[in-house]
Design a protein with these regions (language model features):
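Glycine-rich phosphate-binding loops of nucleotide-dependent enzymes
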Residues: 2-520
Length: 520
């Protein structure tokens, strides 16, 4: 029996100035299936889906819904064709309840009783297996609960075609499994589910078919059961690449950074770090896992001298002098003047890491460089070093003088990582260093971090992919609500165990006990 087509794209093209986001894309989505849209950053996945959802309008091509051509120029038009999109960044009003957010923007001329809306929201939740309190305010919800509200919003409006953009990016493994269970129930109900993602293992777990995009073009659509991770990766990148992460045992580790009982509050007096203690050793990679906004950014910035702490100590064991230096509330300049060789790849690339209007060479000149072990040449002029970074990390740029703000996010990240590694650090902190990078470049960065570890550098790596954390890191520190909930051995840690700690609240005594056990 032939499958019934829910939506079909024919020769869809979309450009932004001289940039071709999508070119002659053909795609078919069937009723009652889960289709994964797979591609690297910049491959055109989100742009293509935004045209189905009415955010953009195609320059060329046709969208066919239910056998008829559809003109979709706004999200309101999309809902008329029973299409709804759940974006990666939620569009909710924090002070409203779940139900109030659900009916916000429903302009059909009807009057709504909130009690009736609450009942219908509860009925939708029960039908598909959601757990949600319709009367709960958004600011009181977890990330997964907020995502549930977004999904119910489109179901309430009658959506039969649902598009989810990176739906698991901020979820724990347990929350991801719950979401997948809900999506499978929707599929059984005849809904068409389109998932935009770059996580290969999730694609193989949840989808029926996979459509691969590369550089704005549709490469192929394959049955998930008939493909493999290696085949999909080759289609995404255009060549065969190795997806192996090398994790050698730490050699002669010694205490390099000792963080003791540090706490901090933000500008509004809200505690963002609560009695944090851990030790980073030379020759190891210490991973930091946590739901977004759990204190990862503040922790690294406090060590780098960019965020004040209210209590505690940050001690650096200087390998040159053998003396312990206290870095508490010192500025980056003061830290450097102490002879501390600390490199930092911040989460905010252009706001904190690089100067957007300056070229790569000038951004490199912002730092002083000393001879050290790295993949880059030592003691060479900044311009030559810029060329070496461009070559080694395959930075796509017209030349080394091009302002970095004109580069893509992934290329900006490569410049920043290259500059920080070239400074020959003894401590290297990297917050989401592969965010925005393609698969090939991501594994290049993982290998660079491993090389730094083998050179005796204490590497602190903040990541969001638990598979990478468990493959790359020697130990994994888990943080939630500004408090350490556990420190695990990276070689034995399970993703599910990390996920539980990411949502668990523990006492300071429990966290210290976990740290002690991890270091034994």
């Amino acid at each position: 029996m032939n499958k019934e087509v829910a939506i079909e794209l024919r020769r869809i093209t979309k450009t932004f100035g001289n940039v071709v986001a999508n070119k002659d894309v053909d795609l078919t989505v069937y009723k009652g299936e889960i289709l994964a849209i797979l591609g690297e950053n910049g491959s055109g996945k989100t742009t293509l889906m935004n045209m189905i959802a009415g955010i953009y309008y195609p320059d060329e091509g046709h969208i066919i819904v239910g056998g008829e051509e559809a003109v979709i120029k706004s999200p309101k038009d999309a809902f008329r064709y029973k299409i709804g999109m759940i974006h990666q960044h939620f569009k909710l009003v924090d002070v409203f309840t779940a139900s109030e957010n659900v009916i916000l923007g429903v302009n059909d001329g009807s009057k709504y009783r909130l009690s009736d809306v609450n009942e219908r929201v509860a009925a939708i939740a029960e039908k598909y297996g959601f757990i949600i309190n319709p009367k709960k305010k958004i600011h009181e919800m977890s990330v997964s609960e907020k995502q549930t509200v977004e999904i119910i919003k489109v179901l309430y409006r009658g959506a039969d075609i649902l598009i989810l953009d990176e739906p698991t990016a901020v979820l724990t493994p347990q929350e991801t499994e719950k979401l997948f269970a809900v999506l499978r129930k929707m599929k059984e109900d005849g809904k068409s589910i389109i998932i935009i993602t770059h996580k290969m293992h999730e694609v193989l777990s949840i989808s029926d078919r996979v459509a691969v995009l590369r550089k704005g073009e549709h490469i192929a659509t394959v049955n998930t059961a008939e493909t493999s991770e290696a085949e999909l990766t080759e289609m995404m990148v255009g060549k065969k690449i190795s997806l192996n992460i090398n994790r050698p045992e730490p050699k002669n580790p010694c205490e390099r950074l000792v963080v003791s009982n540090i706490s901090s509050v933000d500008s509004e007096g809200v505690q963002v770090l609560d009695d944090i203690s851990f030790t980073a050793f030379s020759g190891e990679i210490l991973g930091i896992a946590g739901i977004a906004g759990s204190g990862q950014r503040e922790l690294l910035e406090s060590i780098a001298g960019l965020y004040p702490i209210t209590s505690g100590e940050i001690m650096y064991n200087n390998p040159a002098s053998g003396e312990m230096e206290n870095l508490r509330n010192k500025t980056p300049m003061q830290i450097r003047d102490l002879g501390v060789r600390l490199s930092f790849v911040p989460e905010d690339r252009l706001g904190m890491g690089l100067v957007g209007n300056m070229g790569i060479t000038d951004n490199i000149m912002l730092r002083s460089y000393t001879r050290g072990k790295s993949v880059f040449l030592d003691r060479i002029p900044p311009k030559n070093l810029a060329k070496e970074i461009i070559k080694s990390l395959e930075v796509s740029t017209p030349d080394e003088e091009t302002p970095v703000r004109r580069l893509s996010g992934g290329n900006v990240q490569k410049v920043l990582v290259g500059r920080e590694i070239a400074s020959a650090p003894s401590v290297l902190m990297a917050a989401y260093p592969v965010r925005g990078l393609d698969i090939n470049s991501s594994y290049m960065i993982y290998n660079l971090l491993t090389q730094q570890k083998e050179n005796g550098v204490a590497v602190i790596f903040v990541g969001e992919d638990l598979d990478v954390l468990t493959e790359l890191c020697d130990r994994i520190l888990v943080i939630n609500g500004g408090k350490i909930t556990g420190i695990l051995d990276g070689r034995t840690a399970k993703k599910e165990e990390i996920g539980l700690l990411m949502t668990k609240h523990v006492s300071s005594a429990e966290a210290k006990e976990g740290e002690s056990n991890a270091e034994k």
